[in-house]
């Protein structure tokens, strides 16, 4: 896959040609596989207190899926296949503060639904030529950077069968929020203290006050946009529902299954509304 380098004065005109190769069918195949192994994906740490039989058993009461001796990922995949016909290839956009929980859940959903997976921030970075060039563009021309975020969403929203981890730029303008309406938007609501601790390697270290303050400011700036999502998935609510005392016990399978159940509710409501609007 060819990645074009970017100049320091990258503009929207220069950005679009760099973006399109990343969204070609060949690039989509390259970027999206393999997503996950067949083993259970832990959200936070291999030391998390996991009770998979209990959590999945609790959820099986409402899904109708037998989870005895089942691989948790297989349970998610079966649920995904159950709702896929009603989903009709609609793309799924995950919003919320970027963290490994959101990323892992997005990849699991893509695998379960047999969708392509994209991270919109990564696409912008790759199209710009790397983190340094992307940051230089943002600092030199904030408007051009925002336009690049919109262009990414415009391209992605025109496609189907995608799971997209969207950056905060996706919820900070009315135009971008409108583009999310081309699919189903899901807010992955993770407590800031967990997000601040970072990925697995640094999860047990305490975040710096400066980092926490930065995340809090970003969260407050984007919160109203998050709240417009079709579905809100709270890590704390899932832990409470599954009777976990520690948020670390929640897995990506738990979150993905909850998302699929909420999507199923949305498709049922939509179907009922369509049937009610038909003339006698």
UniProtKB/Swiss-Prot annotation:
GO terms for cellular component: chloroplast; chloroplast stroma; cytosol. Disruption phenotype: Albino plants. Residues 1-54 form a transit peptide. Keywords: Chloroplast, Plastid, Transit peptide. One of its GO terms (biological process) is thylakoid membrane organization. InterPro entries: P-loop_NTPase, Shikimate/glucono_kinase, Shikimate_kinase/TSH1. It is found in: Plastid, Chloroplast. It comes from the Eukaryota. Required for chloroplast biogenesis. Belongs to the shikimate kinase family. This is Probable inactive shikimate kinase like 1, chloroplastic. It comes from Arabidopsis thaliana.
């Amino acid at each position: 896959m060819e990645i074009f380098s970017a100049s320091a004065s990258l503009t929207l005109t220069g950005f679009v040609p760099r973006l399109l190769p990343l969204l070609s069918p060949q690039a989509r195949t390259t970027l999206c596989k393999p997503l996950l192994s067949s083993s259970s994906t832990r959200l936070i740490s291999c030391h998390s207190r996991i009770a998979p039989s209990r959590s999945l058993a609790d959820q099986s009461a409402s899904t109708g899926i037998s989870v005895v001796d089942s691989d948790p990922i297989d349970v998610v995949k079966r649920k995904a296949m159950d709702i896929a016909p009603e989903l009709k290839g609609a793309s799924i956009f995950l919003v919320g503060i970027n963290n490994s929980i959101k990323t892992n859940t997005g990849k699991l959903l893509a695998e379960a639904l047999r969708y392509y997976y994209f991270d919109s921030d990564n696409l912008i970075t790759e199209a710009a030529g790397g983190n340094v060039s992307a940051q230089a563009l943002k600092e030199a021309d904030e408007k051009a950077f925002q336009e690049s975020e919109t262009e990414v969403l415009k391209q992605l929203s025109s496609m189907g069968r995608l799971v997209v981890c969207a950056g905060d730029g996706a919820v900070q303008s009315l135009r971008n929020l409108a583009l999310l309406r081309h699919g189903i938007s899901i807010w992955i609501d993770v407590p800031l203290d967990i997000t601040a601790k970072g990925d697995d390697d640094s999860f047990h270290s305490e975040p710096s006050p400066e980092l926490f303050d930065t995340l809090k400011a970003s969260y407050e700036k984007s919160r109203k946009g998050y709240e417009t999502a079709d579905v809100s998935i709270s890590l704390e609510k899932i832990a409470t529902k599954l009777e976990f005392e520690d948020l670390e016990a929640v897995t990506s399978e738990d979150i993905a299954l909850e998302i699929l159940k909420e999507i199923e509710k949305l498709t049922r409501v939509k179907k009922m509304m369509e049937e009610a609007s038909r003339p006698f």
